[in-house]
Structures are given as structure tokens and as C-alpha cells.
């Protein structure tokens, strides 16, 4: 008898991507995994429920895939992830197209639930009770390029920012043990992974719950000893938790990329206080200055929220001036999303959607000009580049300052075939918006 075919659609952030990889790892022994949902008996949709646009994308995807029932092979729609965890049975009542629903803690029950649905001919299965997630990631099926993997070092969050629903969805902050992480790292290395990207809701607090102290520097040091791992990249670093020890480890450890992602959200002390952020402008400036003093080629990425309740014209001007002066290497701007269940939802002085959009556009245009002015100084530089593949016949890759999917790439001119997943030296010859253009160094004539 042929195995059931299962397809998966993953929405949302890279932390959700890791969940999707765990789901695929859990079902691979029981079912055949297909990439085309038209061929799937069951379609799993791993949803995001963080902000309004993400919720709408999840709902639209559920409705679109539900049309495959009767039209193609689909016998059932399975909904997992943050949207399922956030709304539970309410979501199932709203969308009767859903047959099976699992929260963020129940991925190990997926095969059992699908089998029960088939054998018992049950109409619905709902399984979204809360319990601490088993943070042993298990045997994932990587959905990234074979040489790069996201490595989740902790789950949950204790920060409780006033705009954020994640602690209610994902629970308290829980670190994985160093031993568990290193075991997975060794396995990833044996599979050909060269770049591990450390992620969590807050990577800088790693270890505080397990070891009663923050252990991120020790973790990075341990990972760097694993043969085959060449790049360690840090995302989601809470600004006030960036200690001198973390900065020193980035500066001194050759395998840790001189790159850091710090979601600042704002710079006005007034807005930071309303957001429930612990640090203030002086703390942020101190840490940025310390990073740049100790690591002269550090690449700093950040994300900003505009239109938070109470954001005045003065607050926005302060934010704009800050971005203009600091000149981040990469920056993302998001419009504040008013989410039920958060403290900010009930705040006065909500900003109009029109003004949010205008402020978002203004900051993105500013960042575009900043990038243009910074890129020209990279022409003539030589970088170690991780070869990623080809786009329209042109090789491309990334250097230490480029995280996958969210930052730019380097297009590589080469007279010979390159091997995906290898590191090569590239001399930069030009820039195109957020991307760079270069030539293989030994072909550049120096």
C-alpha cells in the first residue's frame, strides 16, 4: 500500500521555519513528503499569528488550500503554529475548513492525529493545550540551502513588551542545554552545514534559566570548536543584554561573524517606555559605540516599529535623526500592528494607518540613501563569500555581513564553475542597490 502523501506550507519567521523542519522530521517515517500541495493527501499549514498582516496571510492560505479538497488529492487540512496556538478552538469555529489543529507544543502528535482522523473518520481534531515545548529539536529536515541552518537555542520570552503577543503564544523563556545544542551542531556539520544562525526570541539571554547566568559567549565558543562549522551568526539580540563578554567573543572568535541583529524598535525614551522596553537611548548608543569601537567592520542590522500609540512628530524626528546618524548596515521598518491581548491594544493616542504608512516610507527611503552611500566604499574590498547558487545564470553568494533572505547578496563574475557551499575570495567591483557585484579574486588581476 502506498504511503499517504503530506505537503507543508510554512509561513512567518525563521523560528517558525525551524518548527516546520521539526514537523517534516516527525512525519517523514510515516508519510511521503511532497512539495506540490496538489499531490498531497494532507496539507499542513504552519501559521504565523504575530501581527495582523501575518494572520491574514495565514487565513488566506488556509482558505486557498481548502479548495484542494475534492479538486485534487487533499483529504484534510492540518493547521499548526502560532495562529492555532493563539486562537485555539475559536479559529476552528471560524474556519470549518480546518480538519486537524495543533498548537506549537504538539508537533509530536501530528502522525497520531492524522491516523486517528483517517481511521475514526472524525470530523475534527483539536489539540492546542499549553505545555512547555519539548525543545529537543530532533532530526529536522532542513528547508534552507544545504550549507546553512538556523539553530534555535531557546524558546519563549520573558520580556513582555506591550505590543507583543509572543509570550502568550510561546510561553516562558526556556534554553536548550549546551550539550543538546552541540549534539545538533555536530549532526548539522556532518550533513555539510557550514553556517549556523543562532536564533531565539532573545538570543542574548541564553542560559539564564538553566545555568543562572547568561551563557551565549560560552555557547559560541563551544560551537566554534566543531569541525566544519565556519560561520556562526547572531540574530535577535536584545539591545540591553549585549554585554562586554558577547562583544569580546564576536571580536576575538574568528568563526563568529562580525554581524549582529539588534531589534531596537525605537530610540525615543518616551516610546521605549510605552513599549515596555527595559533599556533607554543612552544604553543603546553605548552598546552601538562599544561594538563599533571593538569591531571596526561590524555589520549591524536592526528593525524599527513606526506608528506606536503616542508616537509624536517629535518622537519620529528623533528616530529619523538617530537612523541618519548611526547608519545601520541593514534596517527593516514595520508599521505598528494593534493586537488584541497586548497592553498596547488599549493605549490611547493610536496613530492613523495613513500616518504609519507615511512614516514607514520615509524611513525606508532614508535607509535606501544610506545604503547607496555606504556601498561605494566597499568597491575594491576583498571578502570571503559563501557561494549560494545561480540566479538567471549569474553566481551569487553572501559575505559575513549578509544574513540569508533578509540582507543583500554578492553577484559573482567567474570564468569557471563554482561549487555551491564553498567559500571563495571575491573582489567587489560594483554595487546595485542593496547588492554588491564582484569577481573571483584570483581572476581579478588583483
UniProtKB/Swiss-Prot annotation:
Main location: cytoplasm
Tagged with keyword Transport: no
SMART domains linked: Elp3
Listed EC numbers: 2.8.4.4
Key words of the record: 4Fe-4S, Cytoplasm, Iron, Iron-sulfur, Metal-binding, S-adenosyl-L-methionine, Transferase
Binding site for [4Fe-4S] cluster 1: 13, 48, 82
Signal peptide: none
Co-factor binding comment: Binds 2 [4Fe-4S] clusters. One cluster is coordinated with 3 cysteines and an exchangeable S-adenosyl-L-methionine.
Major enzyme class: transferase
Name recorded for this polypeptide: Ribosomal protein uS12 methylthiotransferase RimO
Underlying gene: rimO
Amino acid at each position: 500500500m502506498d504511503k499517504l502523501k503530506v505537503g507543508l506550507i510554512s509561513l512567518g519567521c525563521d523560528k517558525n521555519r525551524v518548527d516546520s523542519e521539526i514537523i517534516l522530521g516527525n512525519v517523514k517515517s510515516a508519510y511521503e513528503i511532497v512539495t506540490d500541495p496538489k499531490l498531497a493527501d494532507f496539507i499542513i499549514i504552519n501559521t504565523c499569528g504575530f501581527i495582523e498582516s501575518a494572520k491574514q496571510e495565514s487565513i488566506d492560505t488556509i482558505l486557498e488550500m481548502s479548495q484542494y479538497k475534492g479538486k485534487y488529492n487533499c483529504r484534510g487540512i492540518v493547521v499548526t503554529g502560532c495562529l492555532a496556538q493563539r486562537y485555539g478552538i475559536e479559529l476552528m469555529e471560524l474556519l470549518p475548513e480546518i480538519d486537524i489543529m495543533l498548537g506549537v507544543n504538539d508537533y509530536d502528535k501530528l502522525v497520531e492525529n492524522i491516523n486517528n482522523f483517517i481511521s475514526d473518520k472524525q470530523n475534527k481534531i483539536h489539540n492546542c493545550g499549553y505545555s512547555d515545548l519539548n525543545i529537543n529539536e530532533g532530526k529536522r529536515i532542513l528547508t534552507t540551502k544545504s550549507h546553512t541552518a538556523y539553530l534555535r537555542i531557546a524558546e519563549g520570552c520573558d520580556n513582555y513588551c506591550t505590543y507583543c503577543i509572543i509570550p502568550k503564544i510561546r510561553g516562558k523563556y526556556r534554553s536548550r542545554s549546551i550539550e543538546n545544542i552541540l549534539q545538533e551542531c555536530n549532526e548539522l556539520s556532518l550533513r555539510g552545514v557550514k553556517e549556523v544562525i543562532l536564533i531565539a526570541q532573545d538570543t542574548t539571554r541564553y542560559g539564564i534559566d538553566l545555568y543562572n547566568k547568561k551563557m551565549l559567549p560560552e555557547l559560541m565558543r563551544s560551537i566554534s570548536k566543531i569541525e566544519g562549522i565556519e560561520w556562526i551568526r547572531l540574530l535577535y539580540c536584545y539591545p540591553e543584554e549585549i554585554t562586554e563578554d558577547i562583544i569580546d567573543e564576536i571580536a576575538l572568535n574568528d568563526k563568529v561573524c562580525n554581524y549582529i541583529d539588534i531589534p531596537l524598535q525605537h530610540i525615543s525614551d518616551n516610546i521605549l517606555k510605552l513599549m515596555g522596553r527595559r533599556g533607554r537611548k543612552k544604553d543603546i548608543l553605548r552598546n552601538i559605540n562599544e561594538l563599533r569601537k571593538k569591531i571596526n567592520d561590524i555589520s549591524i542590522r536592526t528593525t524599527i516599529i513606526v506608528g506606536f500609540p503616542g508616537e509624536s512628530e517629535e518622537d519620529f524626528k528623533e528616530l529619523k535623526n538617530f537612523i541618519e546618524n548611526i547608519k545601520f548596515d541593514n534596517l527593516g521598518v514595520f508599521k505598528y500592528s494593534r493586537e488584541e491581548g497586548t497592553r498596547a491594544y488599549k493605549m490611547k493616542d493610536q496613530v492613523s494607518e495613513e500616518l504609519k504608512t507615511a512614516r514607514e516610507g520615509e524611513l525606508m527611503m532614508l535607509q535606501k540613501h544610506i545604503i547607496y552611500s555606504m556601498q561605494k566604499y566597499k568597491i575594491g574590498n576583498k571578502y570571503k563569500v559563501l557561494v549560494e547558487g545561480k540566479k538567471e545564470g549569474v553566481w551569487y553568494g553572501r559575505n559575513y555581513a549578509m544574513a540569508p533572505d533578509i540582507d543583500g547578496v554578492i553577484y559573482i563574475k567567474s570564468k569557471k564553475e563554482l561549487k555551491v557551499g564553498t567559500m571563495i575570495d571575491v573582489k567587489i567591483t560594483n554595487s546595485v542597490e542593496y547588492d554588491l557585484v564582484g569577481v573571483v579574486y584570483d581572476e581579478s588581476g588583483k
